[in-house]
């Protein structure tokens, strides 16, 4: 997850409160000092940190927690609300026909962001197109075209044309059937008159509905001055923070943007076109504190299911597993769906009670090992017969040896696959006996288990955030 170090540090501080029936002033002071240290290490502005810590301390000492709420959960709620306020609101971005222009300096990640945003809009049922107008950077056209192909979206660019305004004009005509047109522009080492003039000329031509500034998270609190400079020069409607997975300064960048008149539209991390998320303050902070994000999780599951079912000749329906026999084919489809959801550590962070504190306790390579096992299982199933995939119980010693020879995997891995299937089959049988009321109670228990194991009872539920926001 993005901002891993900050999240781990904040969760560790709050976990120190477990088991305490009441908090003294000294306890609160210690908590505030640890939160200050965590935020300063994330390059959050000193003044912002001081204001936030003062607010947390005042509320923790003066406000009375609801009956039945533990001191830890009450402080957790206060920290959650103050952090949501710190990072600000999300940029308004309706799912409708529009033209978006991206601006930013060299190396901020504009071209990658254009492809990621286009992919994101495509998952919402819209037809996006990328218009590449950068004629200055060598390779900009090729990179943009390649990433558009990865995102499976329309693309326009002209490597033989030197005038970015003409490319923009021609691009609008070529992509007139698109719902969302994303115009990528050139960058510079700094915001100079030449860049401002070029962006203004392109803006005058395309008349974008929204101008988004792309900022590298590594800028930390310096993002404030850059956002303010671009706002003063060309006007911006929102910000995209990129490369959050590669720096400890992401928290500073998020907080800095909120200090200006800007808001955040998207967060980018990773190298694939799917490594982008719409910035939702409540869900983002909820994950940061280890409380999960059911809204983001639901969206990922639905999208992954659609991708898994695309081109499926057997018309696989996961609900069938609750009614009949669970086969290795079903297990394989589940694995494909999990893979389509993205990195496992990100998925785990979205599940209340499984992310946060639990993830902190796992070895650094735990998710890589799990991903590797899933890949091995897939290779092993390629070497199985139709009968074995439909009925794994027929796989004995001789068949295991044959499967090992065909897949190149050790017998131990084949046995792991069969054991994993058996465990999942037993779990599904338990679900088969559940009524709707049982399922609802189970989901409620999961949500109340957020915060790395501490209950959230008596603190509200539903809505966007874990506290009913």
UniProtKB/Swiss-Prot annotation:
Please give an example of a GO cellular component term from this record: signal recognition particle
Q: Does the keyword Transferase apply?
A: no
Q: Which cysteines are joined by disulfide bonds?
A: none
> Pfam families this protein is in?
SRP54, SRP54_N, SRP_SPB
Q: What is known of its domains?
A: Composed of three domains: the N-terminal N domain, which is responsible for interactions with the ribosome, the central G domain, which binds GTP, and the C-terminal M domain, which binds the RNA and the signal sequence of the RNC.
Function, as annotated: Involved in targeting and insertion of nascent membrane proteins into the cytoplasmic membrane. Binds to the hydrophobic signal sequence of the ribosome-nascent chain (RNC) as it emerges from the ribosomes. The SRP-RNC complex is then targeted to the cytoplasmic membrane where it interacts with the SRP receptor FtsY.
What protein name does the entry list?
Signal recognition particle 54 kDa protein
**Native source organism of the sequence:** Haloarcula marismortui (strain ATCC 43049 / DSM 3752 / JCM 8966 / VKM B-1809) (Halobacterium marismortui)
Gene label: srp54
């Amino acid at each position: 997850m993005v901002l891993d170090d900050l999240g781990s540090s904040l969760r560790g501080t709050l976990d120190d409160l477990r088991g305490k029936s009441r908090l003294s002033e000294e306890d609160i002071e210690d908590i505030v000092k640890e939160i200050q240290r965590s935020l300063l290490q994330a390059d959050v502005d000193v003044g912002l940190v001081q204001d936030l810590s003062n607010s947390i301390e005042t509320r923790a000492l003066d406000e009375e927690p609801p009956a039945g709420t533990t001191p830890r959960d009450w402080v957790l709620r206060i920290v959650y609300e103050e952090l949501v306020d710190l990072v600000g609101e999300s940029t308004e971005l309706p799912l409708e026909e529009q033209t978006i222009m991206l601006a930013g300096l060299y190396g901020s990640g504009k071209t990658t962001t254009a492809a990621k945003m286009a992919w994101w809009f495509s998952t919402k049922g819209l037809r996006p197109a990328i218009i590449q107008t950068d004629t200055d950077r060598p390779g900009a056209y090729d990179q943009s075209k390649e990433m558009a192909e990865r995102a499976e979206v329309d693309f326009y660019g002209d490597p033989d044309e030197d005038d970015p305004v003409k490319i923009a004009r021609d691009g609008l005509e070529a992509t007139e059937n698109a719902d969302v047109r994303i115009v990528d522009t050139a960058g510079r080492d700094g915001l100079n008159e030449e860049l401002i003039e070029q962006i203004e000329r392109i803006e005058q031509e395309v008349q974008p509905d929204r101008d988004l500034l792309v900022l590298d998270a590594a800028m930390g609190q310096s993002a404030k001055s850059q956002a303010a400079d671009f706002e003063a020069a060309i006007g911006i409607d929102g910000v995209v923070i990129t490369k959050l997975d590669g720096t400890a300064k992401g928290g500073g960048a998020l907080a800095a943007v909120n200090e200006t008149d800007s808001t955040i539209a998207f967060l980018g991390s990773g190298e694939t076109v799917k490594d982008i998320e719409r910035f939702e303050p409540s869900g983002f902070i909820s994950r940061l504190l280890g409380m999960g994000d059911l809204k983001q999780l639901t969206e990922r599951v639905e999208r992954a299911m659609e991708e898994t079912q695309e081109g499926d000749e057997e018309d696989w329906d996961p609900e069938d597993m609750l009614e009949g026999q669970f086969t290795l084919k079903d297990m394989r489809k589940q694995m494909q769906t999990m893979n389509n959801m993205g990195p496992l550590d990100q998925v785990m962070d979205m599940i209340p009670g499984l992310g946060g504190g639990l993830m902190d306790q796992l070895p650094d390579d735990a998710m890589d090992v799990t991903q590797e096992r899933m890949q091995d299982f897939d290779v092993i199933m390629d070497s199985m017969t139709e009968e074995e995939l439909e009925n794994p119980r027929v796989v004995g010693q001789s068949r295991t040896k044959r499967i090992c020879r065909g897949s190149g995997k050790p017998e131990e891995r084949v046995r792991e696959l069969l054991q994993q299937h058996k465990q999942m089959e037993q779990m599904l049988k338990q679900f088969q006996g559940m009524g709707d009321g049982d399922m609802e109670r189970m989901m409620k228990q999961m949500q109340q288990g957020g915060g790395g194991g501490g209950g959230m009872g008596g603190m509200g539920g539903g809505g966007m955030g874990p506290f009913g926001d």
